[in-house]
Amino acid sequence: MSVLTLKARAGADDVDALMREIGRQARAAARRMALVSGQQKDRGLRAAAAAIRAAAPAILEANRADLTEARAKDLPAATLDRLELTPARVEAIAAAVEAIAGLPDPVGRRLAAFERPNGLSIERIATPLGVVGVIFESRPNVTADAGALCLKAGNAAVLRAGSESLRSAAAIAAAMTEGLVAEGLPADAIQLVPTRDRAAVGAMLSGLDGCIDVIVPRGGKNLVARVQNEAKVPVFAHLEGICHVFVHAAADLAMARTIVRNSKLRRTGICGAAETLLVDRACASTHLAPLVLDLLEAGCAVRGDEATRAVDPRVTPASEADWRTEYLDAVIAVRVVEGLDAAIDHIETFGSHHTDAIVTHDTGAAERFLAEVDSAIVVHNASTQFADGGEFGFGAEIGIATGRMHARGPVGVEQLTTFKYRVHGSGQIRP
């Protein structure tokens, strides 16, 4: 039974029943997906990509309706940009699904193998997580990215789009389902929640009677905070990306300038953008002014401590709140610190455990930074904006996680698996 048929049957007032049925269908699909070969999954994904291309006119028509409604609600320009689809963006969505099909199958990998003295042979094998719930806001492309990643890892996906992107997401999901079914995969392997009712989010966070194994939120801070606070199942997420670049005393100035500019300004609105620059006092006399002036001349507002404000009158005073702020804009906080220990302490106090970088030619300082900074991604002599599954060679990512359990850093297809132990014996019994 399709989700849209179910919606008509359940009625708008029975969201709980709707969601429970979606959960049961997803669990049944997950059991089937766990046994599907890698070749069949890839054929299904390539068929889904072809179906997205074929459905481009319908997808764009649905998107125009979403955009019309969003403009009538006077939503911000940034939201409209994330929501808008063009023929090129639809093609990029299809190409991303094909790229996921081209990744190695993460299921069935032998992660470890050993033999016990009693002759038992034990191996640890990668297996699907089961059912992944994804809650996202205005980006309709997440429908395809998340659905394809989950399916590649042998999972079923329950997707809940933001109300502003529901028509676009539904058109993409319908095309994907058409492709999957054509290759013999279950229609319920990727289900889009067909209602704007916010109660559907609460139902997903409850776990749908054990049918959802993990939740991944893709959106703003308020959404992520709600998911982290209310979910009764594990969550792969990060609340904020308060990323730091520390320019150590042994940093090459030319390298530091290019890394700082790229970390902050390549794209200011992504979670891997640097929000705070820390400069070692031991090199501040030579490094601080060029770094700050580069940022100012590039149009970046600088909020600094006393030493930083002395560089240029355009630098405004930094408050305590600035060290804790994810600007997602052309704004950066700059502080001079008393060496490596102070930099690590600052990051531990104000950071979000996302991505932090050190620029230095001192191998010992770099190793200490990489060992002691407790972030999902720690970087030596490179931009924080490499915090991305594609840049890690994972293909697409479903998000970046900063928790300490299971998935951490970019969450790609391998992170959407778990494992089981297979134990082979020859009649052994335990004494």
From Swiss-Prot:
Keywords for this protein: Amino-acid biosynthesis, Cytoplasm, NADP, Oxidoreductase, Proline biosynthesis
Reaction it catalyzes: L-glutamate 5-semialdehyde + phosphate + NADP(+) = L-glutamyl 5-phosphate + NADPH + H(+)
PROSITE patterns for this protein: PROA (PS01223)
Enzyme class: oxidoreductase
Cellular location(s): Cytoplasm
Any single GO CC term annotated in Swiss-Prot or TrEMBL for this entry: cytoplasm
UniProt-listed GO biological process terms: L-proline biosynthetic process
UniProt superkingdom: Bacteria
Annotated SUPFAM superfamilies: ALDH-like
GO MF entries: glutamate-5-semialdehyde dehydrogenase activity; NADP binding
Assigned EC number: 1.2.1.41
Pfam family name, one: Aldedh
Function recorded in the entry: Catalyzes the NADPH-dependent reduction of L-glutamate 5-phosphate into L-glutamate 5-semialdehyde and phosphate. The product spontaneously undergoes cyclization to form 1-pyrroline-5-carboxylate.
Family: Belongs to the gamma-glutamyl phosphate reductase family.
Protein name as it appears in the record: Gamma-glutamyl phosphate reductase
Taxon lineage: Bacteria, Pseudomonadati, Pseudomonadota, Alphaproteobacteria, Hyphomicrobiales
